[in-house]
Amino acid sequence: MKRAFLSALSVGLAALFLTGPAQAQGNPGPLRIEITEGVIEPLPIAVPPFLAETPAASQFARDIAQVVADDLEGSGLFRAIPENAFISPITSFDSPVQYADWKAINAQALVTGSVSVASDGRLVVKFRLFDVFSDAPLGKGLQFVASQSSWRRMGHKVADAVYSRITGEGGYFDSRVVFVSETGPKNARQKRLAIMDYDGANVQFLTDSSAIVLAPRFSPTGDRVLYTSYATGRPQITLLDVNSVRSQGLGSAQGGEMSFAPRFSPDGRSVVFSLTNGGNSDIYRRDLSSGAQTRLTATPAIETAPSFSPDGRQIVFESDRSGSQQLYVMSATGGEARRISFGPGRYGTPVWSPRGDLIAFTKQNQGRFHIGVMRTDGSEERLLTSSFLDESPTWSPNGRVIMFTRETSGAGGAPSLYSVDISGRNLRRVPTPGAASDPAWSPLLP
């Protein structure tokens, strides 16, 4: 079954890249990522240091180019050629490209750029992408302007544009991740919300450690975060403004003792969450403007972890109504739910892909935890990871990568954040200042 899946993956990805932008321009040798025996061969790409058009831009030029190279290589789809292999330096942003020199080091793509500091102090970043194989530019050059403090974002934006032009998919580099930062011993950890760039840079703390916080979730616009707070001594849903770092409780849930596992609807106007009353947990939906609350499930089972489909019409959630923890899908207005998980073991924390085609989940089976994906009808289940404890998956904005929490065994085991491609490749640890859990990936930043 694994071989069959890899074969199908090869065909799908090959079709994707062969119909990408390069072929659309009619080039004789389209820029693409080669796939052999179900394994993606990373595309060799050269990203020389960007040119500094003004002296004040010198360090920015080198650093921004490094962010671009790191982003692309970190995706697992590209291999950044080291600078010491370059034959000819880039001396002018507008000078003709010496394609033969880049072919000699087996580069298939080339990114050139320049950085200047405008009179108002802002950075101006220009870049161009070239198909070395076809001796031609790949699309038009682009320019980004932003404050100097946003230099890393400009690198991410360039990388997103390069990624998109070569793969035909949207990028995911100019995004952020909110997570739970943990300190202290395992049996008495202090938890606070933190936010960072997708690659672990620019960490900022959003709450102090006076109350336990869990399960942060971004709004569709990325400027608000829902999370569960124990500030009152019991779990309560709280809404935080990322820019002002101000938070407010959503008030006591109607008819319940505890509310947790919140998530925004795709339009940002309502939230779904679990509400516990008398030991029973059901799924509810609440309008953020009116406060009106609707019960979506009504069974004796424990039902939690709801997640909307991208079109807002359906909700996937976990329930033990069948006797074990499984995944179900129902209308966003409630009603009859259909079970979609039937494999061995227990399933939880389902999250709908932003593409709408897959659902990510946590699975426990035979003493191991896995992050997996399945079609929205439950078919084509694939396990991407396996460890002592993997949980809490969250999708990248383009639906290509999943970030999750991994914890090692033993008394001193601390959770960390990892990411993996939906093919199960490119498992990477995401750097954080300390222990970290419960990641939530933002949409692309505006």
UniProtKB/Swiss-Prot annotation:
Domain of life the protein comes from: Bacteria
Cleavable signal peptide: 1-24
UniProt KW keywords: Cell cycle, Cell division, Periplasm, Signal
Keyword Amino-acid biosynthesis: no
Assembly and binders: The Tol-Pal system is composed of five core proteins: the inner membrane proteins TolA, TolQ and TolR, the periplasmic protein TolB and the outer membrane protein Pal. They form a network linking the inner and outer membranes and the peptidoglycan layer.
HAMAP family assigned: TolB (MF_00671)
Xref: Pfam families: PD40 (PF07676), TolB_N (PF04052)
NCBIfam families to which the protein is assigned, alphabetical: propeller_TolB
Family note: Belongs to the TolB family.
InterPro entries in alphabetical order: 6-blade_b-propeller_TolB-like, PD40, Tol-Pal_TolB, TolB_N
GO BP terms: cell division; protein import
Organism: Dinoroseobacter shibae (strain DSM 16493 / NCIMB 14021 / DFL 12)
Cellular localization per UniProt: Periplasm
Coiled-coil segments on the chain, per record: none
Protein name as annotated: Tol-Pal system protein TolB
Entry GO terms, CC: periplasmic space
Record lineage: Bacteria, Pseudomonadati, Pseudomonadota, Alphaproteobacteria, Rhodobacterales
Functional summary from the UniProt entry: Part of the Tol-Pal system, which plays a role in outer membrane invagination during cell division and is important for maintaining outer membrane integrity.
Chief localisation class: periplasm
